[in-house]
């Protein structure tokens, strides 16, 4: 964690840690884990809103809590770039981290695997392995997705791989 | 097939006369004619072989395999047809392994992958440029069925790390329709893990630990110049989760794990060697010849092939692994009895020879050291390390205490309702 910036560090210390080590097939223990996940996400979302740093929406799209969908966005040069966000909870969770997917960017960057799965192998998965089972979805978003967006979106915009919807509309009209 | 095409053309003629607009019919006709032409180009697939023959003729696809039996390497090569092998990951290693097993005449192959063939895969063996765009499983079945139609091929295009994919994976492994008479709970004899990521390996590990399934794991380094294979018998050898990930065990600062881009390097040579080592170990395991390596590494820069054996971790984080270890320990008396019976058989052979000397003037006798063995067994059963060795990793007690403290405070949270929390998050999302 030494290399992370002070803002991320202070944010991380205020996201509640999880204690239940349970995966999707563990019945009541998984329900308990889901409760902790929700508390963690609620706390993180509230923190972001109070700091005027809101940047994602996420919710479970099935009752079992194994499929999550939402949106995330990044502001670059005063323009907001928004993307669909989705991921499955892997069978071996929380021993393994969820694979966060941005399907709209699939194929546009080499920092991505098939289906829009962002590469977290270097900057996040070692952290996850060290902090299992204390890290959860909120931590994956804070330490995995947020830095990835901050690093990659400016490059993709500058290279023209991603266009803002207004720019896209303009080019469509012309 | 050609008869079918001809019938189709005749049907089209009839249709053409009964319809006012012949444009669509002509289009269909040219399409069928094109297909008929393609089918003629395709070489005819050979018919299936009912029984393996050792006859040495050009038309016998198994003559050189059955020669292993004649040369005394394998007792009964025909048993190869009774075996089922599952291959997870049809990439640079898995596809080559599948082809090797198909050419060996394996009975049944189960293939798992969710990726598609792309031109970037042409640096490795097996897939061809004309298969770009197909799923790897479909392309593999297409090629393997032509190489050897005797092999039963089942393909699953899915991601085994998801809940649904995992259930399909485990149920297909336990499906015994291919060889119902076989004893044991599993429907396959061996699982080969040829995946390229940690998450998929952990999923295979979980499935095999739960099913008591023997499997082999393979891997190739990111710089494409080394690799390894590993035999995993749940409870008897280390499972994939027994050793913590390197970054956790070594305390390495994750900042030093630098990598530009995502693309790992790969060579058809290293992939081919690892696939060869994997299938060779599999054949030895299935057909009982040679010595099955518990672990075999390959360092191509120095042509170094290290081997070693890894015991399971008594504090493994995988619950199923701990259960298998317990079963293995409970079965220890049976294994000891079997070993003792074997020793007695050997001893009886020795006794037949009789004493070397007819007289024993000084009454010298060899004393049985059974007591010493018992002491050794007691020591090993208590997990005491041999003299001179120390444990590298800390025990897990401290971690468990921390969990206990945390779970204590967790009891208060039991009163919270999952639905309430869900609604709270939805409300925040809407705001």
UniProtKB/Swiss-Prot annotation, chain A:
Gene3D superfamilies: Ubiquitin Conjugating Enzyme
Gene Ontology biological process terms from the UniProt entry: protein ufmylation
CDD domains, alphabetized: UBCc_UFC1
InterPro entries cross-referenced by the UniProt entry: UBQ-conjugating_enzyme/RWD, Ufc1
SUPFAM superfamilies: UBC-like
Entry keyword Lipid biosynthesis: no
Record key words, sorted: Ubl conjugation pathway
Listed GO MF terms: UFM1 conjugating enzyme activity
Highest taxon of the lineage: Eukaryota
Pfam families assigned to the protein according to its UniProt record, in alphabetical order: UFC1
UniProt-listed PANTHER family: UBIQUITIN-FOLD MODIFIER-CONJUGATING ENZYME 1 (PTHR12921:SF0)
Entry function: E2-like enzyme which forms an intermediate with UFM1 via a thioester linkage.
Protein family membership: Belongs to the ubiquitin-conjugating enzyme family. UFC1 subfamily.
Name of the molecule in the record: Ubiquitin-fold modifier-conjugating enzyme 1
UniProt organism field: Arabidopsis thaliana (Mouse-ear cress)
Curated annotation (Swiss-Prot), chain B:
Listed transmembrane segments: none
Matching SUPFAM superfamilies: Activating enzymes of the ubiquitin-like proteins
Binding positions (Zn(2+)): 239, 242, 316, 321
Matching Gene3D superfamilies: NAD(P)-binding Rossmann-like Domain (3.40.50.720)
Residues that coordinate or bind ATP: 92, 113, 136, 159, 197
Catalytic residues in the record: 263
Region (Disordered): 339-396
UniProt-recorded Gene Ontology molecular function terms: ATP binding; metal ion binding; ubiquitin-like modifier activating enzyme activity
Keywords, sorted A to Z: ATP-binding, Metal-binding, Nucleotide-binding, Ubl conjugation pathway, Zinc
Matching CDD domains: ThiF_MoeB_HesA_family
Record's function text: E1-like enzyme which activates UFM1.
Family of this protein: Belongs to the ubiquitin-activating E1 family. UBA5 subfamily.
The protein's name in its UniProt record: Ubiquitin-like modifier-activating enzyme 5
Species this protein is from: Arabidopsis thaliana (Mouse-ear cress)
């Amino acid at each position: 964690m030494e290399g992370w910036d002070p803002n991320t560090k202070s944010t991380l210390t205020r996201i509640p840690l999880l204690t239940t080590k349970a995966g999707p097939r563990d019945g009541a223990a998984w329900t308990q884990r889901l409760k902790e996940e929700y508390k963690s996400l609620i706390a993180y979302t509230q923190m972001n809103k109070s700091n005027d740093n809101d940047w994602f929406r996420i919710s479970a799209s099935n009752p079992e809590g194994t499929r999550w969908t939402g949106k995330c966005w990044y502001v670059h040069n005063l323009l907001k770039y928004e993307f669909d966000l989705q991921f499955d909870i892997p069978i071996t969770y929380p021993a393994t981290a969820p694979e966060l997917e941005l399907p709209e960017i699939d194929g546009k960057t080499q920092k991505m695997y098939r289906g829009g799965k962002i590469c977290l192998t270097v900057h996040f998965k070692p952290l996850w392995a060290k902090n299992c089972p204390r890290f959860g979805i909120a931590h994956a978003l804070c330490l995995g997705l947020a830095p990835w967006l901050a690093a990659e979106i400016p490059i993709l915009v500058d290279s023209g791989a991603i266009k803002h919807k207004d720019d896209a509309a303009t080019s469509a009209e012309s | 097939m050609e008869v079918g095409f001809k019938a189709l053309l005749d049907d089209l003629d009839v249709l053409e006369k009964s319809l006012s607009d012949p444009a669509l019919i002509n289009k269909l006709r040219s399409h069928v004619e094109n297909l008929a032409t393609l089918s003629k180009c395709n070489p005819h697939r050979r018919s299936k072989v009912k029984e393996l023959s050792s006859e040495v003729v050009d038309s016998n696809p198994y003559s050189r395999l059955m020669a292993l039996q004649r040369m005394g390497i394998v007792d009964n090569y025909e048993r190869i047809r009774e075996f089922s092998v599952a291959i997870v990951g049809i990439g640079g290693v898995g596809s080559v392994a599948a082809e090797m097993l198909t050419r060996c005449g394996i009975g049944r192959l189960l293939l798992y992958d969710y990726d598609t063939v792309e031109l970037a895969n042409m640096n490795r063996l097996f897939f061809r440029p004309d298969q770009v765009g197909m799923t790897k499983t479909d392309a593999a079945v297409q090629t393997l069925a032509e190489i050897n139609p005797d092999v039963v091929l089942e393909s699953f295009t899915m991601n085994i790390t998801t809940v649904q994919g995992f259930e399909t994976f485990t149920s297909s492994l336990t499906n015994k329709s291919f060889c119902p008479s076989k004893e044991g709970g599993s429907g396959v004899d061996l699982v080969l893990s040829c995946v390229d990521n940690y998450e998929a390996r952990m999923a295979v590990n979980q499935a095999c630990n739960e099913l008591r399934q023997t499997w082999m794991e393979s891997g190739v380094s990111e710089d494409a110049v080394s690799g390894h294979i590993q035999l995993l018998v749940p409870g008897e050898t280390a499972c994939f989760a027994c050793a913590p990930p390197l970054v956790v065990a070594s305390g390495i600062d994750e900042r030093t794990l630098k990598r530009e881009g995502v693309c790992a390097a790969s060579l058809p040579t290293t992939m081919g060697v690892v696939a060869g080592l994997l299938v060779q170990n599999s054949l030895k395991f299935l057909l009982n010849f040679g010595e099955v390596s518990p672990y075999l590494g390959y360092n191509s820069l120095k042509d170094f092939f290290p081997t070693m054996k890894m015991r399971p971790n008594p504090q493994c984080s995988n619950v199923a692994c701990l259960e298998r270890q317990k079963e293995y320990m409970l079965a220890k008396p049976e294994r000891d009895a079997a070993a003792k019976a074997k020793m007695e058989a050997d001893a009886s052979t020795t006794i037949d020879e009789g004493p070397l000397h007819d007289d024993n003037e000084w009454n010298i006798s060899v004393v049985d050291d059974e007591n010493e063995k018992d002491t050794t067994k007691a020591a090993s059963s208590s997990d005491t390390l041999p003299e001179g060795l120390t444990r590298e990793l800390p025990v897990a007690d401290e971690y468990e205490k921390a969990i206990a403290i945390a779970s204590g405070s967790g009891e208060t949270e039991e009163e919270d309702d999952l639905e309430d929390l869900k609604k709270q998050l939805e409300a925040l999302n809407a705001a």
